């Protein structure tokens, strides 16, 4: 058993790549170590293409084992279940990073599994998994010539931080992951605190500069440990078939791509496809028998060439816009009467209905990870039903990876403006229902989420808007597109989503289908996105530009009280009897903490006010010189104890009672008396006198 090892430094941390010791029956197997973090990444490549496959079946699975952190899983079975959303997001991040590096037309199945074996809690293992995926591919024999690497970058006090740990990220204004090849950037994922475009671009370029160290190390490992290149074929469009279809139908196709409405355009294209199939099947084109799949792929290639060439030649886009024009936008808020906050955001043929719901601490999501259980106060969910694109399909199933990814992007885009718990004690759930989709539904979700939260009275720091940018590139010629359609995303070379406030960027997500893009294109895309974002924010601000001062009449009420910590036991009562009594009488939820914080959460203002008043009565402090109406709670030989407020009693001597002209032998427990607080000693003992009638 021969083991090969490569060591390099990343942000003053030593990273070790090792192969030959584990999972040797996989085509590629690499362990990546940094400190006490160890990730095993395996690659298996099928040696032939499955029948009927017309796409690249790459799958990436990132898995965290609880034993890696010295823990036993919860639940009845005490074993790991389905991957968490965070694991799915990391799987997507790796997939998006490496997918562009494979040759077009390569359809062999590849499965990559990254397993976290050891975890020290200081660094997230996601970058190690990404590096390991690239390294295991590089030695697997797959056609993976443009080796990819990825790094994370933070930004604190005006300086970029390479490979920041979790504490660094808590203090950072930026969480940026960049992956790419030696010469080009392929993928960007980031969350930021409204940073200028120049800082975002600088972070991307800073990250790319440091990718080269990792790529060199992977290449050295591959040089000594790589398996022989597998034999594979590349699927190619039949050029003669394509020319025959083009000669007969190009005029119709060209005219159809001037129809702005998607549904109308698709109906016409489907009719042309039907005619194309009939033409090819009924005529002896070149003596070959073509399958329906081959014919439709040739047809699709003609569509792709047409749309791309039109844009590069400066002609109008599919819906008649120029490269920088944004589709018509319509904004409505308060569209649903029975919810806490709602917005309907429509941009062209993309429409998102976004609803905000307010809840208490008990509604917070508990997220279990290797770091333990974390309470999530802000949830954002994205639903993409089949009717949004005019199709039939599965409804009511668990969210797909794409839905999870889009929700995460929208949440990251709005996280920077979301209030902290001290400023806003509510738990917030935002749900985006995509009612129509023709591109940029995730960015419509960003805009709708901002609007919906403001409608619900959530005090977000600034409105947030998002825009999706596209790219058409052929050699040195290129065009950057603002607010792309679904077809432009599908037929183009880039999907670059940018979200932010009027002050700067809060989130970026970029995916590339070609071999990378230049600094010049990045700069233009960011500037064009900034102009577009400000345009969208201007339209949103005409409807609502800051949060409503009060929550909806149908929204729950919440009140936070800070009392003397010593009084918490009085609010709770023996065995919880006091607080249970308040809950039963008012219907409110009451949460207490040892710090003295009391949260009252009620379905309406009346219930909340009643609960708050009862708690205030319990915790109120008696004051010297004040008169109180109390009740006798205990008779002694020399006087009586009178309950004044809550659990606070005072001592009333018989001498004071007699001085006021009242007989002491007539006193009974439960009798009401009006008393004056004479003094309170250092021990908190209260001395009373009787108020004369």
Curated annotation (Swiss-Prot):
Documented EC number(s): 2.7.7.8
Cofactor: Mg(2+)
InterPro entries noted in UniProt: ExoRNase_PH_dom1, ExoRNase_PH_dom2, ExoRNase_PH_dom2_sf, KH_dom, KH_dom_type_1, KH_dom_type_1_sf, NA-bd_OB-fold, PNPase
GO molecular function: 3'-5'-RNA exonuclease activity; magnesium ion binding; polyribonucleotide nucleotidyltransferase activity; RNA binding
Compartments (UniProt record): Cytoplasm
UniProt main location, coarse: cytoplasm
GO cellular component terms, semicolon-separated: cytosol
GO biological process: mRNA catabolic process; RNA processing
Record's catalysed reaction(s): RNA(n+1) + phosphate = RNA(n) + a ribonucleoside 5'-diphosphate
Keywords recorded for this protein, A-Z: Cytoplasm, Magnesium, Metal-binding, Nucleotidyltransferase, RNA-binding, Transferase
Subunit organization: Component of the RNA degradosome, which is a multiprotein complex involved in RNA processing and mRNA degradation.
Protein name: Polyribonucleotide nucleotidyltransferase
Species this chain originates from: Francisella tularensis subsp. holarctica (strain OSU18)
Gene behind this protein: pnp
């Amino acid at each position: 058993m021969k083991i090969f090892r490569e060591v390099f430094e990343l942000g003053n941390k030593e990273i070790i790549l090792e192969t030959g010791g584990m999972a040797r029956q996989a085509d590629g197997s690499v362990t990546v170590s940094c400190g006490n973090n160890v990730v095993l990444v395996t690659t298996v490549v099928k040696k032939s293409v499955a029948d009927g496959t017309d796409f690249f079946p790459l799958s990436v699975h990132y898995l965290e084992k609880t034993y890696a952190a010295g823990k036993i899983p919860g639940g009845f079975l005490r074993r790991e279940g389905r991957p968490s959303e965070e694991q799915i997001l990391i799987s997507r991040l790796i997939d998006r990073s490496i997918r562009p590096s494979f040759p077009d037309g390569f359809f062999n199945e590849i499965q990559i599994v990254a397993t976290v074996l050891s975890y020290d809690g200081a660094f997230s293992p996601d970058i190690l998994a990404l590096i390991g995926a690239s390294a295991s591919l590089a030695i697997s024999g797959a056609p993976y010539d443009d080796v990819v690497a990825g790094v994370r970058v933070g930004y604190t006090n005006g300086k970029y931080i390479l490979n920041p740990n979790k504490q660094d990220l808590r203090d950072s204004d930026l969480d940026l992951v960049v992956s790419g090849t030696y010469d080009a950037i392929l993928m960007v994922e980031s969350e930021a605190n409204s940073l200028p475009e120049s800082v975002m671009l600088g972070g991307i370029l800073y990250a790319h500069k440091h990718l080269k160290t990792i790529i060199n190390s992977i290449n050295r490992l591959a040089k000594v440990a790589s398996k022989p290149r597998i034999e594979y074929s590349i699927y190619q469009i039949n050029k003669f078939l394509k020319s025959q279809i083009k000669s007969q139908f190009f005029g119709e196709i060209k005219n159809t791509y001037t129809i702005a409405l998607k549904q109308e355009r698709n109906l016409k294209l489907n009719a042309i496809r039907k005619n194309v199939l009939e033409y090819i099947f009924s005529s002896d084109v070149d003596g070959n028998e073509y399958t329906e799949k081959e014919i439709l792929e040739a047809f699709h290639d003609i569509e792709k060439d047409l749309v791309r060439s039109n844009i590069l030649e400066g002609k109008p886009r599919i819906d008649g816009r120029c490269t920088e024009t944004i589709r018509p936008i319509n904004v409505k808020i308060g569209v649903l009467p029975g919810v806490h906050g709602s917005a309907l955001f429509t941009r062209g043929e993309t429409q998102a209905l976004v609803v905000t719901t307010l809840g208490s601490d008990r509604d917070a999501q508990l997220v279990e990870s290797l770091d333990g259980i974390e309470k999530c106060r802000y949830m954002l969910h994205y639903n993409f039903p089949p009717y949004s694109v005019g199709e039939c399909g599965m409804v009511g199933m668990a969210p797909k990876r794409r839905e999870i990814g889009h929700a995460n992007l929208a949440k990251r885009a709005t996280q920077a403006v979301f209030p902290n718990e001290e400023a806003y004690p509510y738990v917030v759930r935002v749900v985006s229902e995509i009612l129509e989709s023709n591109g940029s539904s995730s960015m419509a979700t960003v805009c709708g989420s901002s609007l919906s939260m403001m409608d619900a009275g959530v005090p977000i720091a600034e409105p947030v808007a998002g825009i999706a940018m596209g790219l058409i590139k052929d050699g040195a010629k290129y065009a950057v597109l603002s607010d792309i359609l679904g077809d432009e995303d599908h037929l183009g070379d880039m999907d670059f989503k940018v979200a932010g406030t009027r002050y700067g960027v809060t989130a970026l997500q970029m995916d590339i289908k070609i071999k990378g893009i230049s600094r010049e294109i990045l700069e233009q895309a960011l500037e064009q996105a900034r102009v577009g974002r400000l345009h969208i924010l201007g339209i949103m601000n005409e409807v609502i530009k800051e949060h409503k001062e009060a929550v909806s009449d149908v929204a729950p009420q919440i009140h936070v009280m800070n009392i003397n910590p010593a009084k918490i036991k009085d609010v709770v009562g023996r065995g919880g009897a006091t607080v249970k009594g308040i809950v039963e009488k008012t219907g409110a939820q009451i949460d207490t903490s040892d710090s003295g914080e009391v949260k009252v959460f009620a379905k309406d203002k009346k219930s909340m006010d009643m609960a708050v008043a009862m708690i205030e009565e319990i915790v109120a402090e008696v004051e010297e010189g004040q008169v109180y109406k109390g009740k006798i709670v205990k008779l002694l030989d020399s006087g009586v104890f009178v309950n004044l407020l809550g659990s606070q009693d005072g001592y009333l001597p018989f001498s004071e009672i007699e001085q006021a002209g009242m007989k002491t032998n007539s006193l009974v427990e439960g009798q009401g008396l009006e008393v004056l607080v004479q003094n309170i000693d250092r021990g908190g003992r209260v001395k009373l006198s009787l108020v004369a009638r």
